[in-house]
Amino acid sequence: MRVLVTGATGFTGGHLARALAAKGDEVTALVREKAAEQDGVRVIHGDLRDPAALAAATAGIEIVYNIAAIYRQAGTATETYRAVNAVAVRDLIEAAARHGVKRVVHCSTVGVHGDVEHPPASEDAPLKPGDVYQESKLEGERLAREAGQRLGIEVTIARPSGIYGPGDRRLLKLFRGIARRRWITLGDGEIYYHLTYIDDLVAGFRLCGEHTAAANRTYILAGGEVTTLNALVGLVADAAGVPEPVWHLPAWPFWVAGAACEVICAPLGVEPPLFRRRVDFFTKSRAFDISRARAEIGFDPRVSLREGIRKTLDWYRANRWL
């Protein structure tokens, strides 16, 4: 299979590109940064916003996996989020259609559902993004579907939840704080949390790309276990061989402080030392229903939370990230 992976220099895209190459696919990666060809992956340098780069990258491709996105970055303009996470998605699908690509798998996020009031949330749960990043991802979904219907190309939307694993930086602070015995939980810690180990997510992406039933469908891809934040902290502490943290502080003063930091730092284009989104980690439940993906395409996450945490922590230690 001839496949294109965008965002292949990132955590998720990199794992996907290497896995596809390992199983025998001819993998092309469209990347912005200078990167040498490795692990059987052919590299094309370019930007999703560049029509010439899209044309070169999609020529001769059968399946496109669009993993590239701009994540939350201080000082990033709303229009930049929209240009990369929405408009460029449409442009990529149009380029793919012109070159006869069969299917585009677009990586969105469960964040398009916003704060889940009645967990677990399915793909049909209300869509109410809570920030500019989530809004841009939701618009990307809409533009992707519209382009697919207009051009007659198959488009599959994947909404991952809480991605983690070797090489991930987003949960590094959690692991590092617990391993160094400096972790304090804000709130009671009884919110739900739903993580997805990277190997399971990669398997889900492949099913989205290759399974006949996945054409023009939307799937939540998440791990097989839902846990509470307290239980998650306990699992990390156990894997790290340290006592489980017991300190808790009220969350609301930190949320207020985060709001103030955002107001002060945003005009300066610097990342706030504390922001509301970070406090939301402690206060908003995230639990999702993956029964559609299980039933329709055979998605079957196999890495237990305990095993995934151990593998991730071992990698952090081996690479001296902890």
Segment roles from a protein language model:
Residues G130-T156:
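Active-site Tyr-X1-5-Lys
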Residues D91-Y133:
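Conserved Rossmann-fold NAD(P)-dependent oxidoreductase catalytic core, especially the SDR/UDP-sugar
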Residues L207-L274, I290, R306, R310-K311:
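Mid/C-terminal beta-alpha module of Rossmann-like enzyme folds, strongest
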Residues G114, I153-L172:
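Flexible, glycine-rich beta-alpha linker
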Residues R292-A295, D300, S304-L322:
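Amphipathic terminal alpha-helices
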